[in-house]
A protein has these predicted regions:
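Polytopic alpha-helical membrane proteins, predominantly small-molecule transporters/carriers
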Residues: 1-344
């Protein structure tokens, strides 16, 4: 029962993340770089900080925790967060050229596979005494492979969509649709985004041990990863503000109330995925295979729900029933990948 509860919590977080781009559509009169930065303040600073505070027992503080933790682990966690930030920037571009459904599917699929494998591999290189590679069991690799198969099937559906639609229909569904360009960007975004889980692996012991409940133990590391990502994104957004002369966005007081609300909502929905991941892992402590695969499971469910939104937003409008069938098959495979390893 605890395993089911854990997976359900992760699924709720995935649904929230896949919905985070909906409130962004309500933001008025701001350029991309302006609203991306402000929603990032909430998604990568405010809510992760509030989450990390849950891991701090009474009489202690976050400053005490970070000061007493291994400096190498802290800086590696932040570093991989900064690399993940690059993935976040290109992630947005992948959706620009492929749409929400296909863009998230390919990027998150790559992120799921590489993120799950890179974490133990790199941790074993820096700290061989941890024997991190022992986590990569047959069941774990199988889970990753099945996830990637599901992603590949959805990718096939995307290429079928590209081949069957006229240029006018493509532009109607996704304004800047460009499958080859979008595919390359999505793969890069997925590779860099996988660094998030690497950061979590390096920071998994940054907590107060038995004084921190299992469900909150990864939240301090999540804060460090998102902090690194915020720095990367802030630098790029400020650069774009200067390049495009959009500093005036921040001076437009008439839209601040509306935009702040929807940026905060988008940030909360985005952070929900990693808050849910931490809570869900607290119920998976007796299932080591699912613990290792938890990030992969989260990404797989993100893909499932992003495609649900893609259907709702009519991004697959005009596609043949055969294309939709392939898409649904891919979604089913991804759902199966979430619990199949536990049956091995």
């Amino acid at each position: 029962m605890e395993i089911i509860i854990g997976l359900l919590i992760i699924a709720i977080g995935a649904f929230c993340q896949s919905s985070c781009y909906v409130p962004i559509n309500k933001i008025k009169n701001w350029s991309w770089e302006s609203y991306w930065l402000i929603q990032g303040v909430f998604a990568w600073i405010v809510f992760p900080l509030l989450g990390a505070l849950l891991a701090v027992p009474a009489g202690h503080s976050l400053c005490e925790l970070f000061a007493g933790s291994n400096a190498t682990n802290i800086w590696m966690t932040v570093l991989f967060g900064a690399l993940w930030g690059v993935g976040g920037l290109t992630f947005g571009l992948s959706m620009r050229y492929l749409g929400v459904a296909l863009g998230q599917s390919i990027a998150l699929g790559t992120c799921a596979g590489l993120g799950t494998i890179m974490g133990p591999v790199l941790l074993n290189i820096f700290f061989p005494e941890t024997d991190a590679l022992s986590k990569l069991t047959f069941a774990v690799i199988l889970g990753v492979v099945v996830t990637l198969i599901g992603i590949a099937i959805i990718g096939v559906a995307g290429s079928m969509k590209s081949a069957s639609l006229s240029e006018e229909e493509k532009k109607a569904a996704v304004k800047d649709f460009n499958f080859p360009k979008g595919l390359a960007i999505a793969l890069l975004a997925g590779f860099m985004s996988g660094c998030f889980n690497v950061g979590l692996e390096f920071g998994k012991d940054i907590n107060f041990g038995d004084l921190t409940p299992d469900m909150y133990k990864t939240l301090p590391a999540t804060l460090l990863v998102t902090l690194g990502g915020f720095v990367t994104n802030a630098i790029y957004c400020f650069y774009q503000n200067a390049k495009n002369n959009t500093w005036g966005d921040y001076k437009n007081g008439s839209v601040w109330g509306n935009n702040l609300v929807f940026c905060a909502l988008a940030g909360a929905l985005w952070y929900s995925q990693f808050f849910g991941l931490s809570l869900g892992k607290g119920f998976l402590t007796e299932a080591p295979t699912l613990m290792t695969l938890s990030f992969c499971i989260l990404m797989a469910l993100n893909v499932v729900f992003s495609n649900v939104w893609g259907i709702i937003l009519k991004e697959w409008k005009g596609c043949s029933s055969k294309t939709i069938t392939v898409l649904i098959l891919g979604i089913i495979v991804l759902v199966v990948s979430c619990f199949l390893p536990q049956l091995i």
